[in-house]
Amino acid sequence: MSPSIKKLDCFSPMLCHCKVACTNSTISLMFGCKKYRHQDEDTGSPQEPSSPQFTDDTPGPELVQVAEKSLSQIENVHGFVAHSHISPMKVESLECIFDGPSPVVKEESPPSPSTPLSNPYPQSPVSVQANPPPVVVNTESLDSAPYVNGTEADFEYEEITLERGNSGLGFSIAGGTDNPHIGEDPSIFITKVIPGGAAAQDGRLRVNDVILRVNEVDVRDVTHSKAVEALKEAGSLVRLYVRRRKSASEKVMEIKLIKGPKGLGFSIAGGVGNQHIPGDNSIYVTKIIEGGAAHKDGRLQIGDKLLAVNSSCLEEVTHEHAVTALKNTPDVVYLKVAKPNSVFMNDSFAPPDITNSYSQHMENHISPPSYLSQPLPPVHSGRFSPTPKTTVGDDDVTREPRKVVLHRGTTGLGFNIVGGEDGEGIFISFILAGGPADLCGELRKGDRLVSVNGIDLRGATHEQAAAALKNAGQTVTIVAQYRPEEYSRFEAKIHDLREQMMNSSISSGSGSLRTSQKRSLYVRALFDYDKTKDSGLPSQGLNFKFGDILHVVNASDDEWWQARQVTAQGEVEEMGVIPSKRRVEKKERARLKTVKFNSKSREKGDNPDDMLSKGQSGQEEYVLSYEPVSQQEVNYSRPVIILGPMKDRVNDDLISEFPDKFGSCVPHTTRPKRDYEVDGRDYHFVVSREQMERDIQEHKFIEAGQYNSHLYGTSVQSVREVAEKGKHCILDVSGNAIKRLQVAMLYPIGIFIKPKSVENIMEMNKRLTEEQGRKTYDRAMKLEQEFMEHFTAIVQGDTLEEIYDQVKQIIEEQSGPYIWVQSKEKL
């Protein structure tokens, strides 16, 4: 019979940081390993033998409100933040990162978050050779034949000895009999080798290696937690017996290419951090451009692996490094290439582009300026991912008139036109992504419209061309002629006209822009804006995303502002029109009224479309639009608060990959110190409960709560100490902590991971049921609604890797020393 557990009272039900303690099987995880937290993933963990057992006579963990009456000024105060190195184990996870020293486990300390930090292995010189030459494991010494998915001849075996460093062993694992990683194979797989860690420095352990034994412990056919335990308890010197599939035979050859007008004429993908094939950091050829040097030579093929270019090695390098090496070559280029075995020689069997990355066209710097580029799917910053490829050059497009047939859709024909003055012609200036013109693929920016359904537009005015297109019916036959040079001159003229128009008074009306008495200010956008979806623009609009900084150079008009975007590199030259605060709020309130009218049967709060508004019934809705900001210099590393699904995986990876840049703080507690604990290392032990309650009332804590009659909390001072040491303090807290840190002048970087859908969540965590995925999604939507204006940025992605790359980029951009903070200026 299951032991009874006292129900927890969570002070922030929306985030429920204590949910991990709400089932019998997870009591031991409440203050210990928090690699994957249940408020993110809603999955139960199997009962572990080590989990504390409670009976009816033994009270379970209880989280109760602290000094209820005296804490009225503190909203949603709950929980506490473990300061551990984001625990070096993932008991309830599919994947574990061994990124910290082996811990000392004390029987009496389930609530101690500091336990995993204790390192029983002194960092003194070790006389034993840490990295001996590879040896082949005598598989006859194993109790039984290794689990083999394939024949014995397909595999090779190696013994690897690693010395556990300050950042642990430096690799991640997945698998086990309870959580097979690949199909039904129960093996323990290496899923990640962390740069800079012990495994990476040794250089022999590879992604997809299978661990057979850790020291003398057999980890074949064991549960995930048993493998974790074996690695944790292995000591400072860890001997790993691993199995890996033998590399397919490759033929290495040298290819000499002479650059032509189209450069080398091929595209690449892959590299460290942007693997084209999971587990493989190689640089692969993904496209041979017709007519280019590689195509004419005929030897380079899709699927070939680039080993070197001239004297520059391309093995184990980033995508950006490979791009630079290929760009900086002379006219004669020598490529060292590995040809795969015959099974891959046919293009239909080429290694799949698993990551859907966009490879770089090597020689796009040689091509003339292109006006053909269509809107590309979003990609990560160039530092973390490949840049988009250029698929076609101007020379490939005919300059002769061509016939294009479009079928009008809900978005019209899906393109914008400009021109029509003094017989200059009508040009396509923009093609809407996903619209009929885009899907057709035969029209492009820079096309001149010759006729529409037989109506000659060569001498038409703008109004005549617009009328012809509007009245053309559902099926529209267009004759277009590509004229990039004419359009280029025309675009320069448009820019000059736009500047004149933006700085002068335009005729009054609903689309007017009054520009008398210019007013300048800086704002942070609290919503996404797509100019193509705003029909009332009086002039060229300016796209922006949530969190972007905008320099509003003219805010004198009630409806429209003129603005430029501000990036980390400075202010962008392009100026455009954006909706004013008043216009945004007016349109959003009108939309919300329509939503409510059409959704009366829905219960309050159930509508995910209400994300932009806040407020109580009977009051005018508070709509997020812009926040006034000013630039400020900081001399500390900003704390980092990540909220939303998968946040714990991201937190763990940040500390694992960059232990010198990210850290965690020491919490406070009123619990008596145990013999093995050190004040200031494991906890700050507060002398009296009364003292800590006073500190809470005086807002010295960003979050606090009670466990087993003892108070736990994270103080502002603890966070400040980490920040002033030059490390970003990773905080596992609620959104309320963002506001408290801002008040304390410790401006955190708040990042919200916004799931695209329930399916998106389930794809990133395949253990979730649909119901659990739905709950996780609903929690994320409520989280966004509650704290949206406090987020520095919002990230979305199809994979965890994509999200992680975005988070790293945001933290880098927002690290300072100059940051934008909320100002008191009135909008």
Swiss-Prot record:
Glycosyltransferase keyword on record: no
Ranges of biased composition (kind: Polar residues): 44-56
Domain PDZ: 159-246, 254-341, 403-484
Compartment(s) of residence: Membrane
Gene Ontology biological process terms, A to Z: actin filament organization; cell-cell adhesion; chemical synaptic transmission; cortical actin cytoskeleton organization; endothelial cell proliferation; establishment or maintenance of epithelial cell apical/basal polarity; negative regulation of G1/S transition of mitotic cell cycle; nervous system development
Keyword Repeat in record: yes
Record SMART domains: GuKc (SM00072), MAGUK_N_PEST (SM01277), PDZ (SM00228), SH3 (SM00326)
Keywords: Membrane, Repeat, SH3 domain
MF annotations from Gene Ontology: ionotropic glutamate receptor binding; phosphatase binding; protein kinase binding
Membrane-topology descriptor: Peripheral membrane protein
GO cellular component: basolateral plasma membrane; neuromuscular junction; neuron projection; postsynaptic density membrane
A Pfam family hit: Guanylate_kin
Domain SH3 span(s) in chain numbering: 518-588
Highest taxon above the source species: Eukaryota
Positions of the Guanylate kinase-like domain: 637-812
SUPFAM superfamilies reported in the protein's UniProt record: P-loop containing nucleoside triphosphate hydrolases (SSF52540), PDZ domain-like (SSF50156), SH3-domain (SSF50044)
Disulfide bridge positions per record: none
Region Disordered, annotated ranges: 38-61, 102-133, 595-618
Record function comment: May play a role in synapse assembly and function.
Family, similarity comment: Belongs to the MAGUK family.
Protein name: Discs large homolog 1-like protein
